[in-house]
Amino acid sequence: MPLQSGGMETIMAEIIKTFKEEIPAMRFIGKKYPNFGPWWGEWFANGWFDLIEETMGGSDAILKIWKNGAGYIGLERRSEGQPFEYHIGMLTPANTPVPEGFEFIDFPAIALGTCWIYGKENEVHNTSKCRSLVTDLGLEIWKDDKDGEWSFENCLCPRYTTPDDKGNIILDYCYFVKNI
């Protein structure tokens, strides 16, 4: 949707699809950080995504149970009156061994409310409209036992990694939602 800014029209990223998908129980393996930041670079430099893929038996192991698996994940937890949590890692099959130096979070079989955000790489990370679009589908955001809401950026190959002929990519942004 075009926006007017200083008399000039600017095209920003847009949400092109919102949908519900079912996922099996999975284990997130990664590291926790105090906020968004330059942490992604160390993941690539240290080969940590490769290590997690090897630990789960290759990316095919997750793709067998979730067609949108094998993405690099920026996992977020928000709850009123509690500190924001940010984790980087990958979702793996349940019970995947956790490499030394990493943490894990087990998620039950559940559903996701997913938005596809289409645009330039530096534009697609504005996820502010996704929550309302997910709830507009009649989906209820799932909360953990401490009242926290979980969501994540799912950076999938090739949707996220290979720009189209316009130089745009698609970022999957997902909320854990109740399986109604």
Spans of model-derived segments:
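A solvent-exposed interaction/effector surface
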Residues: 2-180
